[in-house]
Structures are given as C-alpha cells and as structure tokens.
Amino acid sequence: LIPDDPDVAAEKARFFRTFKIIEGASKPRGGGIAVRPALPPGADVYTMPRPQPKWMGPLASKVPASLPGSTAFVSETSDVQNARSHFFNTYNAQVAATMPSPDSPTYYYSPSAPAYVPDAPQEKWTGPLASAVPAGLPGSSPVVFDTPEVYNAKAAFFNTYKNQVKAIIPRPSYF
C-alpha cells in the first residue's frame, strides 16, 4: 500500500470531518420508531404515517457539486503545472508556425457557383405491368422441365430412400 502524501492526507482528514458533520446534520430528529398501543385482535384502526419534515437546507441549484466547505478542485502540484505549461507552450508554438507571416501576401479563393444541369426527363414506360410478367425471362415458361438424366437421378434417390425407410421400420409380429 502506497502511503498518502502529507497534503493528500490532510485533505482527506478535512473531507472526512466535513462529511461527519454533514452526516450528523442530515440524520432525522425525533424518537425514531413510533410505538403504537396494543389493540385488540380484529380492531380496524387507520394510522397516518409520520409527515416528512420540510427541507430547510439550501436549494440544490445553489450548492456546488461537492460537499459544502470543500474546494471545487484539487490544487495542482508543481510537476503538473510544469507539464501543463510545457504542453501549452509547445501547442502555441505549433499554432504560430502555421500562421502566415505579416508581410506575406494573402490570397482569397472564391469558388464559382455550381452549374445546375437538370436531368433528362424520364421516358414513360410502355411495356407490360410487372405483375403480368413471370419471374423469368420474357417468353420463357415459368416451369423448367427435368432432363432425362436428372429424372433418372431423382428416381434412383427416392427408390434408395424408400428402401432405407423400410429397413428401419420394425415389422409387426403377429403371434
């Protein structure tokens, strides 16, 4: 376990003290558990719950997004400050290198307006409606017939299939 820096340890201790103070202030005041008198069995009694106490603290929009009393940020160490200044100096030097020198001429480019060329008008379709044309080439039959080789191969397959099914189905045994 890495020990905390003395500044970090002091800030943590201050945070926990502030947290305990706020935690104690936010606990409900009062007796805690309400004791009801014993009622006879079957007695219907309506009891109202204790009213919620009205909030007396500050509005949420007025409180920073941290605990009251704590700083909004952790102060930077000297290493972080040096690294940040080095980064910003390097960044500003690179930005300055991209700027034109004050005595160089400046040219402005003015793009020409795009030429508008209207599309050619679409010609009217004079062919048949899509629903009247079969889903193949025009003039072709919607059914393609098998060649003799395909017909014989299908027949051989189905015969083999039937024979295999017959072989695995148990035959009834009559006594």
From Swiss-Prot:
Tissue localization of expression: Calcified shell.
Keywords annotated in UniProt: Cuticle
UniProt-recorded name of the protein: Cuticle protein CP1876
Any GO MF annotation of the entry: structural constituent of cuticle
Organism, as annotated: Cancer pagurus (Rock crab)
